[in-house]
């Protein structure tokens, strides 16, 4: 019987909040970060198109267990819409499919914003990762198929016009999971009777991470010049954010070393006293500030669902 292979790389855990440059895919970015940090595993919390820049949260090691909590968080984008053309991809990359010589007045743009605020029905772009009959919509679109993608409910918490010129308008949006900014540009262009597509897109916030957490890729690549590997990896690790920061919106309990050991073995712990937290389907436990487990609080117990190495 063969022995199980040891995973390659370092067993590090944490979040790297990358400021992704333009013309760089999300999967490519994750591979680059995994290689730089010599991490055993890595994953991202929400695709950012190659034509978009900005925040790409990348989880290393055990932090990949917390990716769903970041993917569900609010996001903020700054984007520019170019009026006069609707494109097949709803951004600069696609072919022009409709055009107009009309341009919207700033007052008309502002009057339209309330329609796209709150819970709205939105049809994702033809070139998107939505699955239709088991296949990605973008694969079908590349084969020349026009597919009927059903509308989905998404939530827009805030949509602001921050600048306007005859053929361009700059916006900022705070939105929930699953919102396509490209679809928003397409739909606003149709409503204004002039058509439109995304000319630039930058993500500046993915809850709970902010702009101050972002690290430019060039800064990380520059550390490759450090010849001593231990010194180089230590310099890279300084940019990591603790795994537990991704869970800051969940209820939290602090446990002692004995309780942490029980949780890591998959066993529940009893919560006593008048300060015991109320029942909740999800909470996280830490010992001395380090993440131990995600679980539920029920019947006076914390019951672990996912555990993290010490």
Curated annotation (Swiss-Prot):
GO terms for molecular function: RNA binding; tRNA pseudouridine(55) synthase activity. It is an enzyme of class 5 (isomerase). Coiled coil: none annotated. GO terms for biological process: mRNA pseudouridine synthesis; tRNA pseudouridine synthesis. Its EC number is 5.4.99.25. The active site is at 49 (nucleophile). Signal peptide: none annotated. InterPro entries: PsdUridine_synth_cat_dom_sf, PsdUridine_synth_N, tRNA_psdUridine_synth_TruB, TruB_C. Responsible for synthesis of pseudouridine from uracil-55 in the psi GC loop of transfer RNAs. This is tRNA pseudouridine synthase B. It comes from Sinorhizobium medicae (strain WSM419). The lineage of its organism: Bacteria, Pseudomonadati, Pseudomonadota, Alphaproteobacteria, Hyphomicrobiales.
